[in-house]
Amino acid sequence: MESVSQLVSNCASRGIPAQQFLNFYHELINEKYGASLNAGNEERESESRKQVFEDVSRELVQAFHSSEDAILLAEYMVHLLFINYDTYLSSALLPQVYSIQSETLLMHFHSLAASFIGKLEDKLIKEQMRQDLSTFILSSCLQCDMSTFNNQLFISIVKYLQALLTLIDDSIDIEMDKDNLKLAVTSLLTRTTKLNRILGKRIGREFETKLNLSLSAKLAMVNSPQIFSPSSGATRFAGTPGSTKPMDLALSATSSTSNKIQDLKLIRFYKNLWLNNKIHHFNTSDSQLLEKFSSINSRLSSSLAEEHLIQEQITDLIETTYTSFAQLVNNKLYHQTNTNFNLLERKYVHFITKRLPLIIKDFLPQNPSVIVNSLQNIDEKVKKAIKSYYSNKNDSPERNEDLFDDYSGNNFDIRHDFLKNLIMLNLRPPSVLNEFLREDQMVDVKTLKTDDSLVIVNSQGVQEKVSDVQEALKSLIADLDIENQYVANGNNYRFSPDNALLKLLMSFDTIAPTKQVEIANAFLQILQKATDTSDLKTLGKVLWILTSNVGHSTTSMLCCISPGPFINAVVKFLEKQQRNSTVSSSDEPDFDSLHSYVTYGMALSFVVFLKTTYDFDIEPFIQNFEESYTLKFLSSIEDISDIFVLQNESAEGSKLYLQNWLRDLFINGSISDSQMKNTNVKDLINLIPFIFKQSVIAVQAGVVSNILNLTSGFEYFLQPFLMPGLIKIMFWLEYYLHSLKNNNPPSQILSSCWELINILICPPSLDDDAKGLHFMILKLNCVRLLNVLYLFRNDESNSSQYGVYAAHESIDPKLEAVISKLEYIASISNIYDVDTKCYETTKEVYSHGTLFSNKIPVTNEHPIDIIMTNQLNSFWNLHSSTYYNYDYLLELIKLITPEKFLVDSIRTLTYKVAAYGIPGVQGKLNTSAIEQVANFLAYFMILHDVQTEEQRLALLNYIESGVIVSKETETKQEPETKLDDDFDMLFGEPFNNTLDETSLVFSQNEQPKSYSSSVFPVLHDTFGVVIAEMKKRYDTSKNNGLLSEAAYENATTFIRKYVENLKNSVV
């Protein structure tokens, strides 16, 4: 039979939660010692229990000595000794606790125990502990020699004792020699007072009143060699985040309180940013998310380095999430520049309604009180902000979706959806909605789903409960005919309302969190198998589903898993296909090989979709940068070369190849079999855009007299095997049309251009195999194309002599057809971060809102300097959140570059602090005001720069040593695991010195290094690389005597704070 020691070791090695371990422990004790613990005779039973638990305690201590996971073992100890309180076990185990060698384990144990006791409400456990305080609980701690303990462990023990003393109502007499007791308490108080005067005074009063001790005189006289003499390390417990200067031990209580307030403000700010960063970058599926979140307090401020029970950690996460979400939607409601950014909001909704319930289910399946406390503790301002936002959203006449449309009223918000998902996971009863949110609106609980089952509606309209998600999806995908999912709607697309798979995806938000994860993993596994086996039919269908993003299902699946594994599988397919992409070696082209061109186009479209929609980089998944066609395609997607050259072919061979294709397309009117046989998909993807560009330029130059000479050849571009070439055309067109608009061409030239474009975008008919790919390609850049097309329509409308009332008669019908088609595509494509009014189709009105090339509109009303001023005032005021939402700020930095953002921030904040101080906190800071402001800016920049621990260490190493640590490519990815190496590639950005406020002579930058294709440096477009260059220049100036020590310290405040905080950051 397994021993208690083995049970602890096995559970710890498997990461079994403490509550589940406790259940296993009870089973083992009952099975192994049941007969001894139930002897029948009360006296014999007491002796047996003592003996049993003495044996058990020895085994437990042995296990605690040998195991390594300190945090988990500390939770086991707290559950055994206090949550599952038993006098016999505690009396045997507590005296042995201090023989454990691991100070980390002891520190976590005492911190967790103090936290539990401080919040203990169980009257029975309280009464049992009160009875045992005088006999062994207090004495077991006070009798141990604490002189060898480090300061952090010592403080945790003091707080543990303080919590125990709060259980005493009057006073007690400890069963311990009176003199030894006084000496122990006096020694403890002396050391405590030196480390934390306030804590020492408070616990001193508790000892005097509750243990009947007179300590004041002895405390002043004591000078025992046993007392620890605190070193500079002791000051870590009251320092300011990011500060490495030792704290004056004589700080007043007022100063200490002020420091703690500063720490709390900065931690709230960092948690807000950290959560935004995780959600924005699809990193919430990380199994260590809760652990990393809970470590922020200790990493940023040792004065707040208390261990918390798992219940408290989840409560903090829930409350922080709701607060951050309230700030997000409040900004959208009142700062109009944020209004059109909706992707981060959707990710937040998924995290709150789907991911948080899963975290609760994983860590606290049997403890619903956490949810109750969290909902009750949400600040009233947070509730008000959320309710106001959803009320405004539901009442808006422009709204086109309702997250909670299964409810009949408008008083529901994200809190209700959070509870609905908890109910589906059986973590809360259905009555919880009316119990906690009754002030909003009552709900008929019978209508709520109370399990996480997945139900699909088959083709006969019958509901079926799915038992095997992966097999069900395989069957639905096999039955899916893409060409039949487009219901006739003029020349537009409309998804079929009768397909079971599309119905499931359209209602994806209503599916239980557990089943969403299963569906996401099933799609990933099907995709990976299809790419590995070259199952082109299945692969094409999956890629069409994912790129279509029906019901925002793709966004939700990426939140469940992260984009990494998906992009890895598709990139492997693209790179593999490019090496063997000739249509056929037989005399006639093979149909399956031609069909593979469509699949290849879908794969490219999916990669472009991830890049343009979610700004996800593919560099980490490329094995050979020099030879990767996928990477070259993405990097030049908006550019069509003026010279056509085949890869691995001479100029003469390329010329002959081009001539043959032009002859077949525009003269012969058909494509010969030999031409088809001797081509490949890469060549066609470059050939079709080249022909299109040269044709359009020829039309613009007036070289083509009869446009009909081109139209018949252009129609061939819509053949399935040629259609992948349209991807680059759709992106290049945006820039070409901007150029065309600036040249003011005559109307007949414009009419010819619209006719050629109309052929590709608005064909009267399409081959069935081409419908899906055609829709995907048009979707990729439709909004940006509309942006420039509206300029032409507005011009034509304004030129009408009858004004806007007759504008539709003067607009070229071919231009209007193109606009109408793209507007419709946009309206059914779930486009993010764009004002939907800009592409809503209308019949009579042509005055659409203005679109912009960037997501951030820069206008006379909202110039960059005002945008920057608003955000920098937020840093200056030490707000707990940013003025603009996180997604907006990332776009802003991308627009003006990290270097300019940093330099402008340093200049502005330095001036503001010097001239005005910090609003509301002047004279209350233990460190300089500029350092406090620098902390806020530094943490913002750090979370912009790094998303993984590997990135953090690489960036820190580069700043301090100038050496770039690279990592070998790892492309293999398990289906269920999240890709942790989601990091950017460094090509390095040149640093143009704009911080030229002094007459310093800086050394020239080193030339950027070249990198091999097998490594992934991590400094591209980061503040860190700018910081490194600035640091190097200031260091050089100081070493050359151009800067004094004081001037150097003053000039590098923001640099030092960035580096110091980068060392402590949780990512």
Curated annotation (Swiss-Prot):
It comes from Kluyveromyces lactis (strain ATCC 8585 / CBS 2359 / DSM 70799 / NBRC 1267 / NRRL Y-1140 / WM37). Component of the Mediator complex. Keywords: Activator, Nucleus, Transcription, Transcription regulation. This is Mediator of RNA polymerase II transcription subunit 5. One of its GO terms (biological process) is regulation of transcription by RNA polymerase II. Signal peptide: none annotated. GO terms for molecular function: transcription coregulator activity. Component of the Mediator complex, a coactivator involved in the regulated transcription of nearly all RNA polymerase II-dependent genes. Mediator functions as a bridge to convey information from gene-specific regulatory proteins to the basal RNA polymerase II transcription machinery. Mediator is recruited to promoters by direct interactions with regulatory proteins and serves as a scaffold for the assembly of a functional preinitiation complex with RNA polymerase II and the general transcription factors. The keyword Transcription applies. One of its GO terms (cellular component) is mediator complex. The keyword Nucleus applies. Belongs to the Mediator complex subunit 5 family. Its main location: nucleus. Pfam families: Med5 (PF08689).
